[in-house]
Structure formats: C-alpha cells, structure tokens
C-alpha cells in the first residue's frame, strides 16, 4: 500500500519529516531552521486525494462480512482516505470537520465539548458555522455530553454504561478509573459496546505536543482494549499511533 495522504501545502510551507503533516519552518536570525510550527486546516489545500483504487479494493476484501466502522479525525495525512464510497462501512465524524470537502458522508457525529465551545464563532476562512450546522435536522445521531434542545439530533453519550462495561474492574485505590482524554476513546468505547468487528482510523495521529502527552496514551489504551477483544484494527501506513522501536531488539534497553 502507498503511504498515507501526500498533504498538499501552500508556498512557504513544508512537511514534517516525522508525521508528514504540513508545517511552517521557524528560522533563527541566521536563517537556519529552529523548529516546526503546524499549519491550521485553512492554511492547507482543501483538495485532498481520496484513497487509491488498489488500496480501496484491498480494504474492501478485508472488511467483507465484518461489521466495520471508520473513525475520521482532522489530521490531514489521512482524513480524506476514509472509505466514503463503501456504504457497508459506518463513518463516524467529529467536531467541525463537516465544513471540509473531503468529509463526503457520515453516519454518526461526535461533539463531546461543553456548549461554549460548539456555539462559538469559528474565525476560519471557508469554515461553515459549526453551531448552525448542528442545529439542522440531519436524521442521524450527534453524540454529546448532554442533550441540547436546540440540536434536534443530539443524543446524550451513554457514559455510565461505558464505564460499567469497561472500567468496573480497574481502580486507583478506592477510586473507579474513567479514562477518556479525547473524543476518540468515547468513539472506541461505543463501537466496542455495539459489537463492531473491525475499526479503521483515519485523520487521528495524536502527534501534536498537546495531544501526545494527554491524548495519545489514552487512544493507545483503547486500541489495546479493542485488540484484546479480538477486534481488527486498521491504521493508514504512516499513522503515528502504536508506533515505536522494538525494545531490546532495536536500540539499547535498560
């Protein structure tokens, strides 16, 4: 399979050598590179390539006969590679990504933030107002922290049920552990609870500084939970999740 999305970038920008995301190089006074600064969605071309035909056909064969869901986040390396043309796969989206052309269809949505977040004005060129979109009738569930009466498709996320199923035997002292540090774990818990047999993840890298510390360990915990339950996991070739050197075999151990 070919590498993940070759992200088209505007003049003056580059690709991160680690994750492939579009970045701007910040230079010192002497002109030498100092560090990378990630670009925002609107700074990158809205025209991203879909998955190639060969890879698409291979993945369709691997999904055959399996209840499959694709999570789609906003990382530009693979967000457009999701199986939008395979109606046998549920597509679960998040936040304001409905504004972008690569988000061609969806079956369920997740907006797991407090009301001031999703009602705010997005001062981003080309992005449709998020809250008015949420207030439209889509006829599909939008999972939220609580039902919002202004949002006709809003559904309260079944957190108590997820906690009872997945965390009843995990404690820190006398405290029952609850471990969801981003939207992806909520999606994963629901998919596992509903018996999905295959989970594909697109546009979720958790490679940024804020994500890497708090969100990535939790995301990888849930990937491990899924694998332990016998669920198939598919990540695009260059995805940064559950990726590292082989301790002892590659590099010196401790």
PLM feature segments, named:
Residues 31-46:
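Cysteine-rich micro-motifs
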Residues 1-6, 52:
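Short Cys/His-rich Zn2+-coordinating modules
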Residues 10-12, 34:
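Short metal-coordination and nucleic-acid-contact micro-motifs, chiefly zinc-binding Cys/His arrays
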Residues 48-254:
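Metal-ion/cofactor- or nucleotide/acyl-coenzyme-handling active-site neighborhoods
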Residues 16-19, 37-38:
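Short cysteine-rich clusters marking metal-coordination/redox-active sites
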Residues 25-26:
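Short, non-ligating residues that shape and space the ligands of small metal-coordination modules
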């Amino acid at each position: 399979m070919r590498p993940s999305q070759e992200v088209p970038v505007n003049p003056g920008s580059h690709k991160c050598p680690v994750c492939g995301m579009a970045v701007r190089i910040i230079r010192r006074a002497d002109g030498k590179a100092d560090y990378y600064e990630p670009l925002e969605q609107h700074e990158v071309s809205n025209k991203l390539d879909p998955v190639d035909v060969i890879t698409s056909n291979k993945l369709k064969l691997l999904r055959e006969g399996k209840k499959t869901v694709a999570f789609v986040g906003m990382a530009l390396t693979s967000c457009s590679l999701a199986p939008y043309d395979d109606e046998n796969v549920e597509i679960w989206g998040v936040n304001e990504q409905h504004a972008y052309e690569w988000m061609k269809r969806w079956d369920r949505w997740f907006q797991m933030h407090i009301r001031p977040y999703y009602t705010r004005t997005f001062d981003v060129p080309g992005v449709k107002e998020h809250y008015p979109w949420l207030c439209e009738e889509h006829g599909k569930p939008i999972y939220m922290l609580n039902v919002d009466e202004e949002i006709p498709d809003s559904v309260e996320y079944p957190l108590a049920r997820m906690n009872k199923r997945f965390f009843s035997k995990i404690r820190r002292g006398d405290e029952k552990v609850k471990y969801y540090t981003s939207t992806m774990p909520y999606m994963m818990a629901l998919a596992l609870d509903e018996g999905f047999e295959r989970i594909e993840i697109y546009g979720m890298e958790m490679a940024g500084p804020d994500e890497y510390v708090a969100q990535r360990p939790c995301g990888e915990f849930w990937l491990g939970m899924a694998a332990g339950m016998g669920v198939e996991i598919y990540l695009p070739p260059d995805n940064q999740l559950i990726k590292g050197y082989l301790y002892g075999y590659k590099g010196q151990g401790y």
